[in-house]
């Protein structure tokens, strides 16, 4: 299971939101490309970027930061936020982005996702952000009655790289993941799944490791890293430990 650090961009800065609320935003001082380079130096194998401005408005305003990150690191980057056309995808690929995440556009135009996943096999990720099991769109500002599980079933026949499933109720809380929600997703698809939302400790990561054999490829972590709850290097060492099966999940050492 891969630990994937997140960089959320607003106005060219690294930020974190609480439960997706744009009014509950915390800014961090490090420049985005510097932050990405630090994650890489800590052992990260991937970088996850969300352009929050583009997710909210549909208009990309953080391309300079995105290009700076792509030039700075030598690991694959996946990016989401306001990606709604083939032209935008090709532009991001030209910057050096490895994979793109389609969220709102995937839900509103499934045929577009099907077409793009055929044109760019293995490079399109479908992002499903859910609150109480129902999908939210447009930067989590709009709530639908569509079940996340129904979307996963539908998209599982496409040539997509993976699903990213975010539980909005836990995102930014540092209070642990919605493990039951993740399990439900894994049960209905053979496509790799990346979980997001709620990780606050290494114990939270260890709780998810047992789902790796069910198709959990990775977990996205943001706030816990920014607030130094643990380091990527520490987490990688624990997750790769040969003693993992003997680790007591009730041990509070990493909590």
Curated annotation (Swiss-Prot):
Localization of this protein: Cytoplasm
Acyltransferase among keywords: no
Classification via InterPro entries: Aldolase_TIM, His_biosynth, HisA_bact_arch, Isoase_HisA-like, Isoase_HisA-like_bact, RibuloseP-bd_barrel
Residues forming the catalytic site: 8 (proton acceptor), 129 (proton donor)
Main localisation: cytoplasm
UniProtKB keywords: Amino-acid biosynthesis, Cytoplasm, Histidine biosynthesis, Isomerase
EC nos: 5.3.1.16
Entry's Gene Ontology cellular component terms: cytoplasm
GO biological process: L-histidine biosynthetic process; L-tryptophan biosynthetic process
Domain of life: Bacteria
Reaction equation(s) it catalyzes: 1-(5-phospho-beta-D-ribosyl)-5-[(5-phospho-beta-D-ribosylamino)methylideneamino]imidazole-4-carboxamide = 5-[(5-phospho-1-deoxy-D-ribulos-1-ylimino)methylamino]-1-(5-phospho-beta-D-ribosyl)imidazole-4-carboxamide
Recorded GO MF terms: 1-(5-phosphoribosyl)-5-[(5-phosphoribosylamino)methylideneamino]imidazole-4-carboxamide isomerase activity
Pathway: Amino-acid biosynthesis; L-histidine biosynthesis; L-histidine from 5-phospho-alpha-D-ribose 1-diphosphate: step 4/9
Family membership: Belongs to the HisA/HisF family.
Name this protein carries in UniProt: 1-(5-phosphoribosyl)-5-[(5-phosphoribosylamino)methylideneamino] imidazole-4-carboxamide isomerase
Organism: Prochlorococcus marinus (strain MIT 9312)
Taxonomic placement: Bacteria, Bacillati, Cyanobacteriota, Cyanophyceae, Synechococcales
This protein's encoding gene: hisA
């Amino acid at each position: 299971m891969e630990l994937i650090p997140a960089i959320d961009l607003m106005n060219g800065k690294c930020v974190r939101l609480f439960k997706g609320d744009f009014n509950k935003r915390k800014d961090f001082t490090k420049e985005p490309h510097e932050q990405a380079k630090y994650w890489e130096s800590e052992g990260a194998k991937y970088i996850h970027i969300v352009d929050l401005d583009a997710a909210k408005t549909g208009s990309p305003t953080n391309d300079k930061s995105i290009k700076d990150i792509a030039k700075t690191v030598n690991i694959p980057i996946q990016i989401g936020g306001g990606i709604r056309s083939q032209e935008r995808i090709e532009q991001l690929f030209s910057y050096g982005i490895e994979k793109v995440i389609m969220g709102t556009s995937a839900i509103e135009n499934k045929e577009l996702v099907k077409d793009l996943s055929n044109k760019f096999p293995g490079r399109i990720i479908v992002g499903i952000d859910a609150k109480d099991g129902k999908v939210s769109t447009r930067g989590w500002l709009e709530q639908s009655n569509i079940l996340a599980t129904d979307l996963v079933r539908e998209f599982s026949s496409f040539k997509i790289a993976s699903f990213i499933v975010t539980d909005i109720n836990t995102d930014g809380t540092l209070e642990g993941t919605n493990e039951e929600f993740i399990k439900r997703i894994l049960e209905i698809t053979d496509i790799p799944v990346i979980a997001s939302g709620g990780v606050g400790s290494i114990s939270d990561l260890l709780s998810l490791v047992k789902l790796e054999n069910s198709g959990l490829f990775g977990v996205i972590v943001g706030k816990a890293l920014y607030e130094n709850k643990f380091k990527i290097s520490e987490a990688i060492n624990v997750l790769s430990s040969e003693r993992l099966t003997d680790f007591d999940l009730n041990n509070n050492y990493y909590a």
